[in-house]
Amino acid sequence: MKNVIAAAALSLVLSDFTYAHEQRDEAMMKITPSTLADADIQAVSPALARFGREAISNDLWQRDALSARDRSIVTVAMLIARNQPGELKHYIAVALDSGVTPAEVSEIITHLAFYAGWPNAMSAVSVAKAIFEARGVTAEALPAASPTLLPLNEQVEKQRADTVEKNVGPISPGLVKFTADPLFLDLWQRPALKIG
């Protein structure tokens, strides 16, 4: 899961395209932008509307390499990182309809706060709150603020800590502490986004 989010962060340029089709059960669910209808796009840029249908809806979102669930996670992560609340509202709903849990949406927002910026995460919180309320998602469906963390791989953590200390410790001891305490010893050990 975290690898998917990391891949999303590296693929931000792809998030400009916001059309999609996705197979859900037996029926095809049409995914369209939350803020613009195809007719509105065509009124300004017929070519952009065509590229959206042909390259994005009929190709990218139809590929088997990612499930609807994983593709939705990547899209939500990119929209959070780029602070695109208009499209985020639509794609959080798509993610929930594609099997992403409210707990996972919550953890994606939390995780990206550290990498995409706190203001972007706060914007995402505002969007997700409205969607959660509309869908009846309660606090019980969300991860605890301080859950039991996943087991720490001590050997890998020591190697990571030693590398960070060697490379940045002499010039930025605060970065060494900050990457260890809230990130690798807490955030990355939270169970709601575990791989698998």
Please give the residue ranges for each predicted region.
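Positively charged n-region of N-terminal signal peptides that target proteins for export
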Residues: 1-4
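Bacterial N-terminal signal peptides
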Residues: 7-15
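Acidic, glycine/proline-rich low-complexity segments that act as flexible tails and inter-domain linkers
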Residues: 19-69, 82, 93, 97, ...
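Short, structured motif recognition centered on aromatic/hydrophobic residues
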Residues: 70-79, 88, 108-109
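Short alpha-helix boundary/capping elements
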Residues: 78-84, 116-117
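Substrate/cofactor-recognition hotspot
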Residues: 111-122
